[in-house]
């Protein structure tokens, strides 16, 4: 999804997002880790990231199991998406940078970018929001290359604006 296309979709959807009678639900899994997903990135603290294989499995640190590395990768993306007042533009930029850096296999990467772009447009129209994550889980705690896991996270976006949203203020 190009930046221009994303902004065009965001402009179309922003007025619906501004309507308090509308509920948006953005649903996505987070990291899909394991050989079957073709994603085996591992990074212990202070180490360079590696793609794990039979030849590189010696990089797994006993004090930092694979499932903690997955949580750290997801945590970087969640931290990028989370923001307070007037932060959607920065969140979008940081999220895209995090995806580029980690190659995280988030299925809904583009719906998340679209949501952040909608919020950015609304912030440009003087509205304020926050986005916070409330829960995180993994389908299994990976310990070896034979394991696989899918991560799940829950977040919310809420308006911090004192007045209701007015779609006519959008440009």
Per-range role (PLM):
Residues 25-28:
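Short beta-strand segments
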């Amino acid at each position: 999804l190009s930046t221009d296309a994303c902004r065009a979709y965001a402009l179309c959807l922003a007025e619906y997002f501004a309507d308090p009678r509308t509920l948006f639900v953005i649903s996505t899994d987070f990291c899909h880790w394991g050989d079957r997903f073709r994603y085996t990135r591992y990074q212990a603290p202070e180490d360079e990231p590696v793609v794990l294989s039979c030849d590189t499995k010696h990089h797994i640190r006993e004090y930092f199991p694979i499932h903690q590395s997955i949580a750290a990768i997801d945590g970087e993306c969640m931290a990028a998406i989370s923001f307070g007042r007037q932060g959607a533009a920065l969140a979008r930029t940081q999220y895209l940078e995090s995806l580029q850096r980690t190659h995280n296999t988030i299925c809904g990467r583009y719906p998340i970018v679209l949501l952040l772009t909608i919020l950015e447009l609304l912030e440009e129209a003087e509205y304020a929001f926050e986005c916070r994550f409330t829960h995180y889980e993994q389908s299994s705690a990976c310990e070896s290359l034979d394991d696989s896991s899918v991560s799940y996270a829950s977040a919310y976006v809420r308006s911090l604006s004192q007045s209701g949203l007015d779609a006519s203020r959008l440009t």
